[in-house]
């Protein structure tokens, strides 16, 4: 960077999420940055280059200017028009409507960017605007000017001054402001997601982000006063509880399987005197605060309201879903009469009149999954609700106990009486005498069970028994918090990056754990792509599990094994699917639910046209490759030979058989082709004019097939006859089959473009480029280009574009070294410059329409552009916090992106791999990350890992553990029990 006054000092450790270029609003001063050239005002001083770079990195940009228009080449997310100051000798620019004074212009730009001022960099050539930006509290103020202007700019308060913006080097990343977080923030705490007002527009998003669960069940963070409707959507979901319904859609009968919305146990309604039943709104909540403590798994909400006769009441609610006893949950509500005396009426209920209505796209589908409801009174304040799903015939039971802490007062006020205020809604009503300044506590404990549970007689008896043995709210809460402490001791990741990034890391970890922590041999459930947080994707299981397993395998490998068992139990259905398609082996479904059949709908709804269009994503057979990859990675981490013999080897062999059966030999060049498939990019399901035909030689599929055949052969050789003999006999594994695999793995075709760039598929290079800027300008969010182009009568099949990473998935799953070895085995060179060219090519051709895309791009960029990697990572970390996909997080979080973003910090930035019975480390920590500290369990041995820009520190806990071999930057070392080893880090300059 040229012309910097001394060494620039960036205040604090803040990462800035937006750059605001504020041009001096006098006519002559404008020309100091925008110089007239060929009748166009072209940005000078590097401004255009800076903005181009920032937009590529996902950093928001804004311009405050007095000019009526900016040049077309000068792209900014926000443009705000400003008036010249009153004392400007040229006078105000006339005929320019909707202009703002300088201070208002800066504030307006910040609001339109939805980034708090403290996270905005202001760059300006005006000493007046420097002074204004400092006064308004903007995080960093950079002066722009030559040597003659440097003094006045610094005197006005600029942190430093430059004369060339293109080389401006700042800690920039897509940091989300308070508004973009749905009104939530972490403040100074990396453990608390806090909201300070009620916002009906954001309530669905908040309900998902404040979901509480334990892997067996999860409950959305909805207001306990509300039933489904308007901004509210209470929902409770139990792992593996699915039901099928049929719907007539445009003359066709469509059958869908959904994760079932279970009875709502949180419902608690109340009123003061004979007033209305209170429901919080933006108008009637005097004070409102909601806090999710991810360290303890407790959701707290406090509000004050004043009724229509002026009585003020404070209501504080705490809620948890037990991490200690997976069938239990609790909710405590404290009522305080601030300025009135009289009767408080409270209804504690279970609402079984629920349906699946969380996803607008499914509004035309049948949605009532629960059948008849049976209610039983179990004693004072205790009720049992029993129901059953209509098709799968899964019985669900909810037993609920409600207590008023000062029970003597409750009895004097009429005690508790059973109440059924609406069909299928039941519970108890309490009339409580209150005095001004007095508080009363109402607690409800619930037990939920299903007929899928082990070691029970009936769900009703099991729920009633669990509730009878349950302690008080405080007793259950104490054990719940202790269970979370144990989980955090294994899964916490410290980065030192500050409140918001730290909160995003912890929140993502929290939601992953809530979705899987009950995994075990008794719970037959997979990894739902949207967690247990909503009804998005119908609650189905996709390949997203591949992004979740690494985080689990290195800490709780038994969870990974249990969830891989979900796939193994459905292997027979996958075999049957392959046979029906005319293939050998096992063809796993793109979307899986209860029994492993293909659940992918054949049509999807385009809200832009109101029409249903074909959905051909069931051609993504690569889900089987992901399953096999997860099996092998689990084995590499655990050396669990028993798992291979009992389940893993069979999964790998049958998937290998399927893909080996897909290949067709081309004698012209002695290569093998795979046709009729889709890669990870869902925007290409065929060629122009032939949607749904599949692709020829998708690079990801072909390379992964070669990898699978190689590793399956290695696994067979490793197990040999001693371990695998009976299995090989049962599978009828023949020598000629293995010989065929050995040949296929070396002769599969991989397409390339000019410059050694891996082609996404054969024929990709023949497609025209896409007009990215045109569509971004027209539509803003273009993650769903498939729907946008369909509405225009076009198709994503026609262009060089992708919804998400496809080819680059290979560099996500494999190091560049391992990928190079694979391609060389197949007869192709892939030198380092080809790796860089491939990454650069696809970097600018993705719509990032999947939350997984930023995860993959962050990982891939970590070796080439560490700042760019951090930029992608911050977007991945905040995908659900900012609802990056546009009003989708209310339908459930994106579990793969949450787990994958945390995994980047641990495995990617440390370069951690498990190969050849060693831990491999190749650190590449970005400059924005002061440190990464975490723990893993490698083959039952606890290892603490700490990485800073200067050193890698490894500590193997004391005990009888054998030494662990570690590879660090080309050298192999032994780490012994109780030993701490330090290794200097040579971080690349990228």
Where are these regions (language model features)?
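C-terminal capping/lid segments that line or modulate ligand- or cofactor-binding pockets
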Residues: 202-237, 548, 599, 690-718, ...
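Non-catalytic C-terminal accessory modules of carbohydrate-active enzymes
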Residues: 254-308, 314, 823-847, 856-990
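Acidic/polar, glycine-enriched structural segments that form the non-catalytic walls/loops
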Residues: 180-537, 792-793, 989-990
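Short, acidic loop-to-helix structural element flanking the phosphoryl-transfer center
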Residues: 36-63, 103, 107
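Helix-terminus loop motifs that line ligand-binding clefts
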Residues: 516-533, 558-629, 635, 642-646, ...
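Active-site core of glycosidic bond-cleaving carbohydrate-active enzymes
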Residues: 538-547, 551-570, 710, 714-717, ...
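Acidic, Mg2+-coordinating phosphoryl-transfer loop and its flanking beta/alpha structural elements
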Residues: 121-160
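Conserved Lys-Pro-Asp/Glu-containing loop-to-beta segment of HAD-superfamily phosphomonoesterases
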Residues: 18, 98-128
């Amino acid at each position: 960077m040229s012309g910097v006054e001394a060494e620039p000092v960036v205040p604090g450790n803040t990462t800035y999420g937006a750059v605001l270029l504020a041009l001096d609003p006098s006519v002559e001063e404008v020309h100091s940055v925008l110089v007239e050239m060929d009748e166009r005002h072209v940005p000078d001083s590097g401004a255009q280059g800076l903005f181009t770079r920032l937009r590529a990195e996902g950093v928001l940009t804004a311009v405050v200017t007095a000019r009526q228009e900016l040049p077309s080449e000068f792209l900014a997310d926000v443009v705000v028009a400003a008036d010249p100051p009153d004392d400007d000798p040229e006078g105000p620019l006339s005929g320019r409507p909707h202009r703002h004074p300088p201070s208002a212009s800066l504030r307006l730009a910040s609001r339109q960017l939805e980034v708090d001022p403290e996270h905005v960099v202001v760059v300006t050539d005006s000493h007046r605007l420097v002074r204004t930006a400092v006064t308004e509290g903007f995080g960093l103020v950079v002066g722009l000017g030559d040597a003659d202007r440097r003094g006045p700019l610094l005197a006005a308060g600029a942190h430093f001054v430059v004369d060339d913006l293109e080389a401006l080097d700042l800690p920039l990343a897509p940091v989300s402001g308070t508004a973009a977080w749905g009104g939530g923030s972490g403040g100074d705490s990396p453990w608390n997601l806090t909201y300070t007002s009620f916002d009906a527009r954001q309530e669905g998003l908040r309900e998902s982000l404040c979901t509480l669960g334990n892997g067996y069940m999860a409950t959305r963070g909805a207001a306990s006063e509300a039933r489904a409707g308007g901004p509210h959507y209470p929902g409770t979901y139990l792992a593996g509880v699915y039901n099928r319904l049929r719907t007539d859609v445009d003359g066709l009968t469509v059958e869908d399987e959904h994760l079932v919305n279970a009875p709502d146990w949180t419902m608690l309604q109340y009123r003061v005197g004979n007033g209305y039943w209170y429901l919080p709104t933006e108008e009637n909540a005097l004070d409102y605060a909601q806090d999710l403590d991810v360290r303890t798994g407790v959701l707290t909400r406090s509000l004050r309201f004043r009724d229509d006769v002026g009585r003020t009441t404070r209501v504080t609610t705490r809620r948890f879903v037990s991490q200690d006893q997976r069938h239990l949950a609790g909710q405590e509500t404290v009522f305080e009469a601030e300025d009135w005396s009289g009767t408080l009426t409270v209804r504690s209920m279970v609402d079984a009149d629920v349906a699946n209505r969380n996803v607008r796209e499914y509004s035309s589908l049948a949605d009532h999954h629960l059948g008849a409801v049976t209610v039983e009174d179990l004693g004072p304040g205790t009720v049992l609700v029993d129901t059953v799903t209509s098709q799968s015939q899964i019985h669900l039971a909810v037993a609920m106990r409600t207590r008023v802490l000062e029970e003597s007062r409750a009895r004097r006020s009429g005690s508790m009486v059973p109440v059924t205020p609406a069909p299928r809604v039941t519970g108890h009503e309490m009339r409580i005498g209150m005095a001004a300044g007095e508080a009363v506590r109402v607690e409800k404990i619930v037990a939920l069970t299903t007929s899928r549970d082990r070691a029970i007689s009936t769900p009703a008896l099991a729920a009633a028994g669990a509730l009878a043995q349950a302690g008080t709210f405080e007793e259950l809460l104490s054990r719940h918090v202790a269970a979370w402490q144990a989980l955090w001791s294994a899964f916490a990741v410290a980065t030192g990056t500050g409140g918001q990034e730290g909160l995003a890391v912890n929140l993502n970890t929290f939601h992953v754990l809530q979705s899987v922590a009950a995994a075990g041999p008794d719970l037959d459930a997979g990894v739902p792509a949207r967690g247990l947080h909503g009804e998005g994707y119908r609650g189905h299981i996709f390949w997203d599990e591949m992004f979740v397993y690494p985080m689990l395998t290195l800490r709780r490998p038994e969870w990974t094994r249990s969830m891989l068992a979900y796939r193994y139990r459905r292997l027979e259905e996958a075999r049957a699917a392959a046979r029906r398609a005319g293939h050998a082996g096992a063809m796993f479904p793109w979307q899986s639910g209860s029994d492993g059949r293909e659940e992918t709908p054949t049509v999807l709804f385009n809200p832009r046209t109101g029409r249903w269009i074909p959905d051909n994503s069931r051609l993504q057979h690569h889900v089987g490759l992901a399953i096999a990859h997860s099996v092998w990675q689990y084995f590499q981490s655990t050396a669990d030979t028993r798992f291979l013999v009992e389940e893993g080897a069979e999964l790998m062999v049958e998937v290998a058989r399927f893909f080996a059966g897909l290949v067709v030999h081309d004698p012209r060049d002695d290569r093998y082709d795979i046709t009729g498939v889709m890669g990870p990019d869902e925007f290409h399901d065929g060629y122009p004019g032939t949607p749904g035909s599949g692709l020829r030689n998708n690079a990801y599929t072909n390379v992964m097939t070669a990898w699978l055949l190689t590793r399956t052969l290695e696994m067979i050789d490793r197990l040999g006859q001693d371990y695998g003999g009976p299995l090989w006999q049962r599978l009828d594994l023949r020598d000629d089959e293995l010989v065929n695999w050995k040949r296929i793995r070396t002769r599969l075709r991989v397409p390339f473009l000019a410059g050694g760039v891996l082609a996404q598929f054969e024929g990709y290079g023949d497609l025209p480029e896409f007009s990215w800027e045109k569509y971004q300008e027209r539509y803003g969010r273009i993650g769903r280009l498939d729907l946008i182009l369909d509405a225009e009568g076009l198709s994503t099949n026609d262009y060089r574009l992708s919804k998400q990473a496809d080819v680059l998935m290979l560099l996500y799953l494999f190091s560049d070294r391992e990928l190079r070895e694979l391609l060389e085995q197949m007869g192709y060179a892939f030198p380092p410059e080809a790796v860089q060219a491939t990454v650069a090519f696809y970097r600018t051709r993705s719509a990032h329409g999947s939350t997984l895309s930023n995860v993959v791009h962050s990982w891939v960029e970590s070796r080439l552009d560490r700042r760019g990697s951090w930029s992608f990572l911050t977007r991945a970390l905040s995908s659900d916090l900012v609802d990056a996909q546009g009003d989708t997080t209310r339908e459930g979080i994106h579990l793969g992106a949450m787990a994958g973003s945390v995994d980047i910090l641990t495995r990617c930035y440390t370069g951690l791999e498990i190969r050849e019975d060693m831990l491999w480390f190749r650190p590449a920590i970005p400059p924005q990350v002061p440190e990464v500290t975490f723990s893993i369990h490698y083959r039952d041995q606890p290892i603490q890992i700490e990485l800073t820009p200067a050193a890698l520190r490894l500590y193997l806990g004391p005990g009888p553990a054998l030494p662990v071999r570690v590879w660090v930057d080309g050298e192999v070392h032994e780490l012994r029990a109780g030993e701490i080893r330090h290794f200097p880090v040579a971080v690349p300059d990228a």
